[in-house]
Amino acid sequence: MDFETNEDINGVRFTWNVFPSTRSDANSNVVPVGCLYTPLKEYDELNVAPYNPVVCSGPHCKSILNPYCVIDPRNSSWSCPICNSRNHLPPQYTNLSQENMPLELQSTTIEYITNKPVTVPPIFFFVVDLTSETENLDSLKESIITSLSLLPPNALIGLITYGNVVQLHDLSSETIDRCNVFRGDREYQLEALTEMLTGQKPTGPGGAASHLPNAMNKVTPFSLNRFFLPLEQVEFKLNQLLENLSPDQWSVPAGHRPLRATGSALNIASLLLQGCYKNIPARIILFASGPGTVAPGLIVNSELKDPLRSHHDIDSDHAQHYKKACKFYNQIAQRVAANGHTVDIFAGCYDQIGMSEMKQLTDSTGGVLLLTDAFSTAIFKQSYLRLFAKDEEGYLKMAFNGNMAVKTSKDLKVQGLIGHASAVKKTDANNISESEIGIGATSTWKMASLSPYHSYAIFFEIANTAANSNPMMSAPGSADRPHLAYTQFITTYQHSSGTNRIRVTTVANQLLPFGTPAIAASFDQEAAAVLMARIAVHKAETDDGADVIRWLDRTLIKLCQKYADYNKDDPQSFRLAPNFSLYPQFTYYLRRSQFLSVFNNSPDETAFYRHIFTREDTTNSLIMIQPTLTSFSMEDDPQPVLLDSISVKPNTILLLDTFFFILIYHGEQIAQWRKAGYQDDPQYADFKALLEEPKLEAAELLVDRFPLPRFIDTEAGGSQARFLLSKLNPSDNYQDMARGGSTIVLTDDVSLQNFMTHLQQVAVSGQA
């Protein structure tokens, strides 16, 4: 099975598809054994089983029956490839044959619809910032009201609005608009909040109100769950309430920012859900119009003379409030993730709102982080509504309360995960590595929210430390069978249809001695580039940017020294196999990307870009690392061209896709013809068609992209042409003469050609 087919069917893509047989050999490979896995990958031929799975009874195993199991029909038993335990088959599996084979023995990926009941529908808790301009707030209200029509009628809804104070709206009151008002400058605790809202002190463990009405009980005028009511019951009142919202009336002195209690609002929202809906699917959806200016969670002082922190301020420890704000929001993130709740953050302003400090709220829960200039923009409106996209059966594509366990045979141990999840530390698994990459020290992770587009990077360590085992031998009695390492991904989650489901993917990879040609041939350079990029982005959160780039360079050099063909000290002899040849190029563009080169970005922009990158699959991640460039001309059909300054020509139109924005660039000659209006003359219909062609292709790219990319239409000499030029390899820069009508790029960045020349020189010299 090739890389793409495995990804389409199983949602998994490995860096190496044949593993080295020992740990030391794997370490010599430089690029770690790992995979990019999309648990809820959409697949038309996915088998869905309407029953509970058959689970292995082996200690510390709990893996699920799969096609790699050895079935013994005579004894009605099966052997688990993960732990080699023998298990009895249930009575309904007694008459197995080639014609009568259950779905789980036919498919490496299967989904079970279990009989575990769903007791409470999902909860959507809107947290709205009122310190906004009227036009911006009106657009936001319109989008929220539209989104209500996309939610299940039985979904529970809550509403908080805030400015200088936090207002918790009581939707149970039919006759009047009633809300509880809290101080914006106070960090409330669950006990105090519960007592204020119910009149009773909580006495249960962990601050839970054990004697109070809980999520399962009837809503009463004094119960904590009165703030969350079914949409079908409160839709009219909620729409009326939203329509009547107006900007915060608190006066803002000249030279000051509005007083904005974002931290307190999020704290109250998370505590309220913990108090009555712990481990029940819930989303806190925050709409922020600016930075928090009130502690707790203060991002910047209200005086405009105090600027928002920059990357330089953070790196030099001059960001006065940064560490304290990070600590506050990280505490909320830990609470929310532990309770199975999700936080989505939508920013609608030109200013930074503090995404850099708040990023753990979304990154640890699978929530959305979206940075836009205003709530009136198409990017916000369409991206927000795409959050509530539905499948062919009319159910929301979002899934809730996910939990993913990775089971491995004794050949592998799990090092960690990089993606939007949090660790489940209480686990009896025995396949956990002592060395960690990303979120480690566990083989089980919690995903409060996940979707068909959430992908996770998972890293493995070869467990075998000795080279004395025969890698061609597997279990006793299998002399001719290759030695396989088995991995099973078990993802439990709540489907939006109101059912509990389990998605199971089982894969097998051969283990061979180091130096075997099959190992090199199994290298997936695209998956490897994305997984190494995720490690680099993860390192960049704590390490110096220059150190991360040096680490990338060292790993690239070592990989080339290991797998390139060359004569020592002869750069001209350097050759890479086709499945390695693009990897240096990916590394070059990654070094220049906004994920690692943050010079021209704000901390919020960096948090946003890294958030999106660490959730996407291989294809989309590669577009972010190395954008695609397509050329349109009168002479040729549309064709992909090099991401290089030599591709910019006067008589072509270029379409650039960076994932975050899509740009159409008209060459100098094309731009002149367009300004002259030739496209309006019927005799130049071909020119008109040429102008329309990139627009049609751009529209196709926009259909399913989340978040919606920014669209830029520019031309040679235009102010926004810089967005294209900044992404190009500067093979023609101001130090050289432009060739063949190509464009000169004003930059001091090293070109790809010089990068490759230097790589070859260092690799063949034996340096690292």
Curated annotation (Swiss-Prot):
Main location as per UniProt: membrane
Keyword Phosphoprotein in record: no
Cleaved signal peptide residues: none
PTM characteristics: Ubiquitinated. Ubiquitination is required for the formation of the SEC23/24 complex. Deubiquitinated by the UBP3/BRE5 complex.
Residues with PTM N-acetylmethionine: M1
InterPro entries: ADF-H/Gelsolin-like_dom_sf, Gelsolin-like_dom, Gelsolin-like_dom_sf, Sec23, Sec23/24_helical_dom, Sec23/24_helical_dom_sf, Sec23/24_trunk_dom, Sec23_24_beta_S
UniProt GO MF annotations: GTPase activator activity; zinc ion binding
Subcellular location per the Swiss-Prot or TrEMBL entry: Cytoplasmic vesicle, COPII-coated vesicle membrane; Cytoplasm; Endoplasmic reticulum membrane; Golgi apparatus membrane
Pfam families: Gelsolin, Sec23_BS, Sec23_helical, Sec23_trunk, zf-Sec23_Sec24
GO biological process: COPII-coated vesicle cargo loading; intracellular protein transport; macroautophagy; positive regulation of ER to Golgi vesicle-mediated transport; positive regulation of protein exit from endoplasmic reticulum; regulation of COPII vesicle coating; reticulophagy
The UniProt record lists the keyword Metal-binding: yes
Positions bound to Zn(2+): C56, C61, C80, C83
A Gene Ontology term for the protein's cellular component: COPII vesicle coat
CDD domains, A to Z: Sec23-like (cd01478), Sec23_C (cd11287)
Topology of this chain in the membrane: Peripheral membrane protein
PANTHER family reported in the protein's UniProt record: PROTEIN TRANSPORT PROTEIN SEC23
Subunit structure: The COPII coat is composed of at least 7 proteins: the SEC23/24 complex, the SEC13/31 complex, SFB2, SFB3 and the protein SAR1. Forms two other heterodimeric complexes with SFB3 and PDR17. Interacts with BET1, BET3, BOS1, EMP24, GRH1, SEC16, SEC22 and SYS1.
Family affiliation: Belongs to the SEC23/SEC24 family. SEC23 subfamily.
Its biological purpose: Component of the coat protein complex II (COPII) which promotes the formation of transport vesicles from the endoplasmic reticulum (ER). The coat has two main functions, the physical deformation of the endoplasmic reticulum membrane into vesicles and the selection of cargo molecules. SEC23 interacts with BET3 in order to target TRAPPI complex to COPII involved in internalization of plasma membrane proteins like the maltose transporter.
Protein name from the UniProt record: Protein transport protein SEC23
Recorded name of the encoding gene: SEC23
